[in-house]
Amino acid sequence: GDPVAPSVLLFPPSKEELTTGTATIVCVANKFYPSDITVTWKVDGTTQQSGIENSKTPQSPEDNTYSLSSTLSLTSAQYNSHSVYTCEVVQGSASPIVQSFNRGDC
């Protein structure tokens, strides 16, 4: 089948979670094909290497697409010491799909 680009959503940590000392940021890429996809996390422009967990769903029997959720886990202190959080999703040779948020806007 033809490649299908994902729709990408980025979810900041909840205020409730931050009070517990942890900050979980979730980037979701929905309905893409083929399954070859790369997620890159950046914090204030710096690529993150640790604290990342990816989970991909099996191929959907309805439309043969895949979905992926990528979670970046930080402490509240780490989270509060930075501003811009970015999730970049790259599929094959397509240009990256970028979602980001500014902590101050949340």
Swiss-Prot record:
Residues 6-99 form the Ig-like domain. Residues 48-64 have a biased composition (Polar residues). PROSITE patterns: IG_LIKE. SUPFAM superfamilies: Immunoglobulin. The keyword Disulfide bond applies. InterPro entries: Ig-like_dom, Ig-like_dom_sf, Ig-like_fold, Ig_C1-set, Immune_Resp_Modulators. Gene3D superfamilies: Immunoglobulins (2.60.40.10). Disulfide bonds join 27-87. The keyword Disulfide bond applies. In Basilea rabbits, the major type of light chain is lambda. The kappa chain shown is a minor component. All other rabbit B allotypes have 'Cys-64'. In rabbits two Ig kappa light chain genes are present, C kappa 1 and C kappa 2 or K-BAS. This is Ig kappa-b4 chain C region. It comes from Oryctolagus cuniculus. The gene is K-BAS.
